[in-house]
């Protein structure tokens, strides 16, 4: 996820920072708890090697496609493998590890504004795990004030950078875009969530899912956002997530050939 300093975020609120402010990637589940093993199995780790550490997160949205963000495709580490259905940061203890055969960014991605910060990975073979549901195109699955859940393997401590070995989750409240726009230069391809000090995403979670839970199990979970950018980890500002509903046409053009 990309980071704007707390000072810069305050300046944005005062109109002192332009909409072209640079963003810095984030990757952490701060203030969360371990997700029970065997749940949220659509959550995907992106790795350079079959048993290496996940450096980004993603979501299995079809048997052969993982949804993530563009930073995960252009970093130092190559997105060569995904871990699906695993509870752990690395290794081959559980779940499955599948080779990535293609990776592409949204055709409308804007690296300056961060708009359409969405990417897709195509897998060498189908996953046996059930994909997460995609949101409705009319944005009805994401409403200001609702609670959502961020899931990932990012740092659990900041600035000491304590790594999460097990999958973590934290509940975050969704903001109205107009309200969030007083802090950040956001547009309708983004959604803000969080804002409680000590509960946030940061280093390690980039690309991972922001989920709308619709029941006690995972069957009806919907991926409404993807970890994209924000202020320094856990300082009390919301994180900014890619709004998945705005990318559905592009996603379907690849996963369904439409």
From Swiss-Prot:
Which SUPFAM superfamilies does UniProt cross-reference here?
A: Trypsin-like serine proteases
Q: Which domain of life is it from?
A: Eukaryota
Annotated keywords: Disulfide bond, Glycoprotein, Secreted, Signal, Virulence
Q: Which InterPro entries match?
A: Peptidase_S1, Peptidase_S1_PA, Peptidase_S1_PA_chymotrypsin, Peptidase_S1A, Trypsin_dom
The keyword Ligase belongs to this UniProt entry's keyword annotation: no
Where is this protein localized, as stated in its record? Secreted
User: Ranges for the Peptidase S1 domain?
Assistant: 29-256
Q: What induces it?
A: Expressed during infection and the expression levels increase with disease progression.
Q: Where is the signal peptide?
A: 1-19
Keyword Disulfide bond assigned:
yes
Q: Which residues are glycosylated?
A: 90, 105, 110
The Gene Ontology biological process terms listed for this entry are: proteolysis
- Return the SMART domains for the record: Tryp_SPc
UniProt cross-references to Pfam families, sorted A to Z:
Trypsin
Q: List the disulfide bonds.
A: 56-72, 180-192, 202-233
Chief site of localization:
secreted
Instruction: State any single GO MF term.
Output: serine-type endopeptidase activity
Q: Name one GO cellular component term.
A: extracellular region
Q: Subunit composition? A: Forms an apoplastic complex with host endoglucanases in tomato leaves during P.infestans infection.
Protein family membership? Belongs to the peptidase S1 family.
Protein purpose: Secreted effector that suppresses host plant glucan elicitor-mediated defense responses. Targets host endoglucanases and inhibits the endoglucanase-mediated release of elicitor-active glucan oligosaccharides from P.infestans cell walls.
Q: What is this protein called?
A: Glucanase inhibitor protein 3
Q: What taxonomic ancestry is recorded?
A: Eukaryota, Sar, Stramenopiles, Oomycota, Peronosporales
